[in-house]
Amino acid sequence: VLEKPCGDCRGGGRKEKKSSITLKVPEGVNTGTRLRSSTNGEAGLQGGPNGDLYVILHVRPHEIFDREEDDLICEVPICFVTAALGGELKVPTLTGSASIKIPASTQSGTTFRLKGRGVKNLQGYGTGDLNVRVNVEVPARLNKEQKAKLQEFADLCGDDVNPQSKSFLE
């Protein structure tokens, strides 16, 4: 038993000290990834070596992309004319944007894969994919001429205007 223990360590031989360190965070980390910083942990007992500091990461959700392992998922709206007739669509990526070809008769919920446009694998085994899911949007307001043209289209289609609902009811 110490007769006069130190005021800083109370006789334990160690005292608490706050410090900042810089860690290199590799590409591909996800929530729960644990990084180790050697000898930046608690001081060793009786002059022994310092312990290691472990930092558990929490990755903030992205405003555009959802993540499933190394793959990214992105939902993009398209107009119903592009869905029906096909066309080109510019989509966001981690590094900018890319164009995808939308085939005619594309349905809402269809997913297009852009290989290698996801997140780098933490162990260095390639890169995930970017999966773009399209949501077909119908105009909220139509003028008289647009309504007339759509009605004309519906009349031309007859019973085939909604083929999926037909198979659903059978």
Predicted regions located by residue number:
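Non-catalytic interaction modules of co-chaperones and other macromolecular assembly/maintenance factors
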Residues: 1-170
